[in-house]
Swiss-Prot record:
Reactions catalysed, as given in the entry: 3-methyl-2-oxobutanoate + (6R)-5,10-methylene-5,6,7,8-tetrahydrofolate + H2O = 2-dehydropantoate + (6S)-5,6,7,8-tetrahydrofolate
Domain of life: Bacteria
Naturally occurring in which organism (per UniProt): Tropheryma whipplei (strain Twist) (Whipple's bacillus)
Entry keyword annotation includes Cell membrane: no
Pfam families recorded: Pantoate_transf
Binding site for Mg(2+): 54, 93, 125
Record-given protein name: 3-methyl-2-oxobutanoate hydroxymethyltransferase
Cofactor: Mg(2+)
């Protein structure tokens, strides 16, 4: 299959300046997004960025862990998001196994993502151990967002789903410095203690984005499914602002009832 390349629009590309620390004078706000229709809605919500996250592994594809999603699966989703929100700053996660092996592999993957989706930047997990990969991708001309603290792709190595920074604060602090020095334009801190996140935010020069990392990061990011109530699990740091799952179920049941009772379709539902 021949795959046409897409070039990011100048509008999306220039918005990376919004991530310069303190340039907005307010918190940056972002959500994950996985499809065209949702992207179209979110494009009018004054968000600073959208992330096509590898969290799609569970919430979209139904895999048991984040590491199961493959590159093509992420790329297909990201291309739809870019089409739905053409003027948004869109970041795409590099899936597990697509960048760790070598600088060359990391660069190839990052460039493929940008060329095939038209996204603005990529995100990868890992601090000091991935600094070389970040530097290589940045040198190749692709903006990189880092990700430290709890890193879902390596959940087994972290000993499960738990808060980071209680007994490894020094290592996470060094990770933040390494990501900054490698040339990342921002860094996600996931499930990091609030005090550590506050310290890191005050001492590094790149923008920090918190995911369950307290009140003092430069910005906040959540999985949209958690925010709108379209996920089975309730996450402590992600309050539900709606219950879309219940709304959808109610609509479907009402429509089914109308069909069975002969109330659908009515005359105005029939094409002329």
């Amino acid at each position: 299959m021949i795959c046409m390349s897409r070039k990011p629009s100048p509008t999306r590309r220039t918005r990376i300046h919004r991530f310069h620390k303190g340039s907005c004078g307010r918190k940056l706000v972002g959500l994950t997004c996985y499809d065209f229709s949702t992207a179209r809605v979110l494009s009018d919500c004054e968000l600073d960025f959208l992330l096509v996250g590898d969290s799609a592994s569970g919430v979209i594809y139904g895999y048991e862990n984040t590491g199961s999603v493959c590159l093509d699966e992420i790329i297909y989703l990201a291309a739809g998001v870019v089409r739905g929100a053409p003027n948004s700053f869109i970041i795409v996660d590099l899936p597990f196994g697509t960048y760790e092996k070598s600088d060359e592999l990391a660069v190839e993957t990052a460039i493929e993502v940008i060329k095939r989706t038209g996204a603005s930047a990529v995100k990868l997990e890992g601090g000091a151990r991935m600094a070389c990969r970040i530097s290589a991708i940045v040198r190749a001309g692709v903006p990189v967002m880092g990700h430290i603290g709890f890193t879902p792709q390596t959940i087994n190595a972290l000993g499960g789903y738990k808060i980071q920074g209680r007994d490894n604060a020094d290592l996470i602090y060094l990770d933040a410095q390494a990501v900054e020095q490698a040339g990342a334009f921002a860094v996600v801190m996931e499930m990091v203690t609030e005090d550590l996140a506050k310290t890191i935010t005050s001492e590094i020069k790149i923008t920090t984005i918190g995911v369950g990392a307290g009140r003092y990061t430069d910005g906040q990011l959540l999985v949209i499914n958690d925010l709108i109530g379209l996920s089975e699990k309730k996450i402590t740091f992600a309050p539900r602002y709606a219950s879309i799952d219940n709304t959808v179920a109610s609509c479907v049941k009402l429509w089914r009832k109308d069909v069975l009772e002969g109330n659908f379709p009515q005359k105005d539902h029939i094409p002329a």
